[in-house]
A protein has these predicted regions:
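Conserved polar catalytic motif of the HATPase_c/GHKL fold
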Residues: 48-60
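Glycine-rich/acidic phosphate-handling loop/turn and adjacent ATP-lid/helix
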Residues: 84-118
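Glycine-rich ATP-binding loops of the HATPase_c
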Residues: 131-142
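Glycine-rich nucleotide-binding loop
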Residues: 96, 140-147
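ATP-lid-like helix-loop hinge signature
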Residues: 37-38, 59-81
Length: 160
């Protein structure tokens, strides 16, 4: 993977190898994840977003495969810019089941140790908010989509 950001490249390669060990036929597409030279979002923060998003997507694909061995598993990660806003989108297959608590804005982890797990989306949201951005997600059928928006503006990286 070559995105223009070393941290993103390392994470993508690491997570890809982790995923194919347990889901050999998973398709991971990051061709449209690109970072320009005038990126004002710190690499560490990009790593927090991509690392947590990929962990969640890989776990969702694992769960889908465990329930339906013939299911197609995929993760697509892309980025784009609109004005001064930078977006990262992660789309992945999942089993179609979303568990939420009434007051929770994010799906609830299904892992038994929910104190150590279930923080990924909250970490992504916190990171996006550092750049005056936010997080949105949708689930349609068996496709989960996470969208992260951040302001990519000179000086933002110094506020964080």
């Amino acid at each position: 993977f070559r995105t223009g950001n070393t941290v993103a490249d390392v994470l993508l390669n690491m997570k890809y190898h982790e995923a194919v060990r347990t889901i050999p036929d998973i398709e991971i597409d990051a061709e449209r994840l690109l970072f320009s030279e005038n990126m004002h979002i710190q690499s560490y923060d990009i790593g927090v977003i991509i690392g947590n998003a990929l962990d969640n997507a890989i776990e969702a694909c694992r769960k889908l495969k465990a329930e339906q061995q013939e299911a197609e598993t995929f993760i697509r990660i892309s980025s784009f810019t609109r004005g001064k806003m930078f977006f990262i989108e992660v789309e992945n297959s999942f089993n179609g089941k979303v568990r939420r608590k009434k007051q929770s804005e994010f799906p609830v982890t299904e892992k038994s140790d929910n104190r150590a797990h279930g923080m990924g989306l909250a970490n992504i949201k916190h990171t996006a908010e550092k750049y005056h951005g936010g997080v949105d997600w949708t689930a349609e059928g068996k496709v989960f989509m996470l969208s992260v928006m951040m302001k990519n503006e000179r000086g933002m990286e110094n506020e964080c």
